[in-house]
Amino acid sequence: MATPHHPRRGDTRRRIQEVALALFAEQGYEKTSLREIAERLDVTKAALYYHFKTKEDILSSIAEDLAQPIRDLLAWAEGQPRTLATKQEVLRRYSDILWHSADLFRFIQENQASVRELTIGETFKTSTAALGDLMKDPGAPLAAQVRSVTALFSMHAGMFVMRNVEGDPEEKRAAILEVALDLVAQAETNLSVN
């Protein structure tokens, strides 16, 4: 006799996160209610409330899922020498993180005013600043420091700007990474010239 399939708690949590993020992106964080999220999921508000008490709880859980890979990247990078190869590997790994969390990063960029007021805003700001610090050499000429940090931020801007450009998403991702790698290599080249 077949047993009925009951979604595991983690599956429900993940579905709530996906639906909420889609609604936040469609109509904005402020304009989305828990009731709308529950309706889209075809569950009661009480069932949704069992998993998350507020919209911020949902968003914080999504951000926490993203924060761990970034913390792992920071921990790895802090144990490495600040060489061009390390910086390039940071960019490659960060590209993977961005790629797998593209919807969240788009949401953050499109809802900056709302995000700034939430815990996720501070978390994102802190981890991005830490990555930026790892990318630059404090004793380097200012132009080299700017190039190194711009390499990181060009990946954010590239994701946002290139999303409406025709083409294969993987090719766009590769092109964005190529530009970031070029910027950090140029920063290192300027260091060896000076």
Language-model features: where?
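Helix-loop "lid/cap" segments that line or gate small-molecule binding pockets
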Residues: 92-99, 110-114, 134-135
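Basic/polar, acidic-poor N-terminal "presequence/leader" segments
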Residues: 51-66, 70-72, 78
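Helix-turn-helix
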Residues: 15, 19, 23-57, 61
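Actinobacteria-biased recognition of intrinsically disordered, low-complexity terminal regions
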Residues: 1-10, 189-194
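Solvent-exposed, amphipathic alpha-helical segments
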Residues: 19-26, 69-76, 154-161
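Hydrophobic alpha-helical connector segments
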Residues: 61, 72-104
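Hydrophobic/aromatic-rich alpha-helical bundle segments in the mid-to-C-terminal region
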Residues: 105-106, 110, 117-194
